[in-house]
Amino acid sequence: NDSNGDSDNAAFDPNIPVQVSGINPTTGGFGQRLVISGENFGNDPSIVNVFVGGKKAIVINVKNHSIYCLVPSQAYSGEIEVQISNGDNPVVSTIAEAKFEYVRKQLVSTLCGSRRDDGGYDTKDGPFNDCGAFGSPNWLEFDPKYPHLVYVAADRGAGDENEGNGNMRILDLKNQYVGTALTEGDMGGTNRGRALAFFDENHMAVAVDQGDELRAAVYGFTRNREAPEGDERNYKMWGNRLALVNFKACNTVTFHPVDGDMYFNSWDKGQFFKVEKQQIQEIFDGTRTTPADKEVLFQMDNGWEYNIRIHPTGNYAYIVSINKHYIQRTNYDWASKRFVTPFIVAGTAERAAYVDGIGTSARFNTPYQGVFVKNPEYA
């Protein structure tokens, strides 16, 4: 036993090959504790470097027959290399026959935005690491023409205590920059731009929450310039504001992905409205000068706040109730081209909590947007 201990504590010998005989465990993710077994590692952690998948690992301890380290992040390829530096001599390097199977962990981290030390924040354009923060963000939507641009609708009227505003922001994922798409003034002076949807590549609808049913519930905008290129950072690409439909207390807007009709709601009595595609097209074309007609397909009850998310096939939609804490489904009747009376698929009305479960036994607390996953790698 004493001889084994002496052997384990032996210093690195540059005249003897460095060998890796095994790794334990053989699979794991970022931060996994990893033991590399072998010969002639020495006893000095300061001269030993380990790379997993080409990424440098943190070496915790070294003995002549083993190295204890932590798996680095993004070590996808899994090759394990041990390097030993010995003064002015060439670096000794060896690669293990076995590969480490790197398992990606599901992590949530900050993309952009930060608060000041006093807890408040600034609302400003800037790179992801210096863009202030977002006042009451409500809805995210990708630009169909420029998929590296993500729009963020903000409901400044929701009571945020900080310095945010109701401007619609843009996340430029390619250039890692936050810009402004529409100001409160661009949206008719409202600071409650609740959601947005695209009629087509060059026409956008914005749901606004205001209290006069004779004013716009949904505004339409036309793209009047292309996305910025190079070092340019002007994201004001939308103009020619038009009232697509009038009503009050609108929380959401969406378009049927096949038939193209527009759907929006009202918090007032929980109405679920339909507007025909042809009328929206005429407004954008300039052949109709008044807001579109609307039809109530069904309604919930007083003070029902919700978002609508239609499945890409158009076969059905989810109604995500924000203030009633549950999710309904409404199927699409292709013959009549309208959504029918909804039914509950998850949660129970006015029972806010966080509980995993099936159907009405599940619980939500202020659910919001939701998304349908098209890429099977993310399903």
Spans of model-derived segments:
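Glycine-centered loop/turn positions within well-structured domains
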Residues: 57, 65, 78, 119, ...
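Conserved beta-strand positions in repeat-built beta-propeller and related beta-rich domains
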Residues: 142-144, 149-161, 198-199, 205-213, ...
